[in-house]
Amino acid sequence: MFKMKSCKLWLRGSFFVIVLVLIYLPLIIVVLVSFNGSSTRGNIVLDFGNVLNPNPDAKSAYLRLGEADFAIPLLNSVIIGLITVIVSIPIAIMTAFALLRSRQWLNKTVFGIANFSLATPDIITGISLVLLFANTWLSFNQQLGFFTIISSHISFSVPYALVLIYPKMQKLNRNLILASQDLGYSPIATFFHITLPYLLPSILSAILVVFATSFDDYVITSLVQGSVKTVASELYSFRKGIKAWAIAFGTILILVSILAVLLVTLHKYLRFKHKEMLRVKQWKNS
């Protein structure tokens, strides 16, 4: 009996370790390869021996990053991502408010459509958007570019934000809103003092997801981008090997992501400790 339990625990632990390895091993390889230097053509060098004994003649991938002509695609991606966030999040919040006050059948229908949009393949969404722009935007002798990219990103980002914000809004105690209005607060003041602080964690999560999805998107962007270049389109345009600067840029993004996760974890820990201290003070005062 004891051996059977030990075997089950070992299998569970092994499965957990295998999953972690499959998730994080590619990221570790990217970080290691970024220190290998680069070839004469600026491509990556897949020789892990160079990590411990780097070739002094090999140019660092991070130096290639400074020489690469990706500043404009990076700026374009950041601008597109920020505008997408600025437009998508308010639309999702207003939609969530409308769903909260709507009838149940309409509520389920709209939320189901949002979930269906998330399950739709990107290539289908991209083709449908191209057909839409071909019969509207292009018919006015306008070109594919920033407008079509941003419009497309907003169209697939709003469902992400809605799915993250609406479940949190459903749990909001409406008595708090009624009490705020009884105290003389206007609906706008109630929103900023009651609703917004309550929804803030979900809104921040939605902002991160929307920006990351917009920044990373290639399939839809490639169909509606016209002559505008983004980081994703630049990375997918490689034909003769992966450039070293791309690996260096990926390593920087990995480190930034790790730092962001650590900051969020630290913030949650500090909030938890603060609540514990308040509880102790209340217990002592009572």
UniProtKB/Swiss-Prot annotation:
The keyword Plastid does not apply. Keywords: Cell membrane, Membrane, Transmembrane, Transmembrane helix, Transport. Belongs to the binding-protein-dependent transport system permease family. CysTW subfamily. The keyword Cell membrane applies. It is found in: Cell membrane. The chain crosses the membrane at residues 15-35, 78-98, 113-133, 145-165, 191-211, 244-264. GO terms for biological process: transmembrane transport. It comes from the Bacteria. The gene is potC. It is a multi-pass membrane protein. One of its GO terms (cellular component) is plasma membrane. PANTHER family: PUTRESCINE TRANSPORT SYSTEM PERMEASE PROTEIN POTI. Residues 74-264 form the ABC transmembrane type-1 domain. Required for the activity of the bacterial transport system of putrescine and spermidine. Pfam families: BPD_transp_1 (PF00528). InterPro entries: Bact_Polyamine_Transport, MetI-like, MetI-like_sf. It comes from Mycoplasma pneumoniae (strain ATCC 29342 / M129 / Subtype 1) (Mycoplasmoides pneumoniae). This is Spermidine/putrescine transport system permease protein PotC homolog. Gene3D superfamilies: MetI-like.
